[in-house]
Amino acid sequence: MTKYAFTLIIFLLGLIPQHAVAQLPEEELFLTEPDADDVGRHFTPDIFRYRVCFKDKAGSPYSLERPEEFLSVKSLARREKFGLKVDEYDLPVSPAYLKHLRDKGFRVLHQSKWNNSAVIETTDTLGAESLQEVDFIASVTRVWQAMQKKEEDSTLDYLTGFPVPDLTADTTRSVSPYGPNPHQVAHLGVDSLHAIGLRGQGVTIAVIDGGFKCADRIAGLRGVNIVGTKNFVDTGDIYATSGDHGTMVLSCLAAFQPFQLIGTAPRADYYLILSEDRASEYPVEEDAWCAAIEYADSVGVDLVNSSLGYTQFDTETMNHTYQDLDGQTAPCSRAASLAASRGIVVVNSAGNSGNDTWKLIGTPADGRDILAVGAVDDKGLNTFFSSLGPSIDGRIKPDVMALGDEVWVYDSEGQLTQADGTSFASPLLCGGVACLMQAFPTMKPTEIIRLVKASGHNAQHPDNVFGYGIPNLWKAFVEGQR
């Protein structure tokens, strides 16, 4: 697997006053919380996790005639607005099947209604593998095993190993309200949308990511309307984690500190959802991602940004292959595609593998009817690291491009930092899409995506380097009014 966080050049600005953050509504919706000691047990030998897939949802007390029992009012309203019916995929995993697993002594960590699966943790590998013989279980696959904790070097980018130069901080005030590089908003035409009052108001965005360290205390994020948080890695505070990748991604979307940094959707509402485990690289993170996006659906979000991707893992036999990139094979890709079919616009980073042996997009960027975003530099050229397409079934990937080179973000210390990666191209584009969704609240997500692609500079000749190109979202807005 390749994780997509490229923080290269550290600059300075701003310290971090406190601000209150709204607590998550009590809408657990049958998603299992990890145990409090989960983090400490990550590195205990002889612990394994398995993905258990079920054949059906028999024995469930839930019914398609009573969807209010497992979906929020807002989630149901989104489906109704777009003429989408609740179906079997939306029914929770059978509680009877989960009880069977617990009665056998397994700890249930995650569950996915869309994949009809659960993740169990155990030291009993023979017992887990014998579940294959249970008549309602379709498959059992190992997705994680305990390992030694990885050493982290603070002088390196925490995921990619790029050295961070020791540069003198620049405390000068920017000339533009958008900060040191107004182009990072203007290249998508989003500044023009902002100028007419389209800043994401009324749109709810879920940010599925790694750590959101100190995102609740950074001055430039003080005004963000965070309506809820959720942690699918452990039971810790998402703001107290050691990682700040999610914080940097959030600043691309939601920062609002004029003459320092303004994001592309500073007036949207946000759920911050932690699914990425920095301690190791295993397929179980895809299961956490599925739980995260299903949670986002259940609370009624309109839009998802995910700057995560999965291809290669700590155990090579678990790696994905190109044949998996069909939008339906990897669990997270299936979940992304199903989210799209439920009226959610999913925006995902294409990946940073363009210059390594993999070269291709990752999962869930191969999802169907979503926007996979590659990275360009300030001159509009594709970056050396931006992942390539197509999907195995021949779909154009990436779908579109946005600035992913020397993007200005806030780090966990509240300093302005320049970062590289499709991780940052994705939220810049996602925020612009939120502005379009504000302008056209009844427009179907598939039509929003069509407008975005059609506005790309490469729309007449889409390829598997640029996709449909760099969108001009002002052009998309004008077209949408016709």
Each model region followed by its residue ranges:
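Hydrolase catalytic cores
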Residues: L250-L253, Y271-D277, L360, G404-I470, ...
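Catalytic-core environment of secreted peptidases
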Residues: D216-T229, A375-F424, Q460
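Aromatic- and Gly/Pro-rich amphipathic surface segment
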Residues: S63-K104
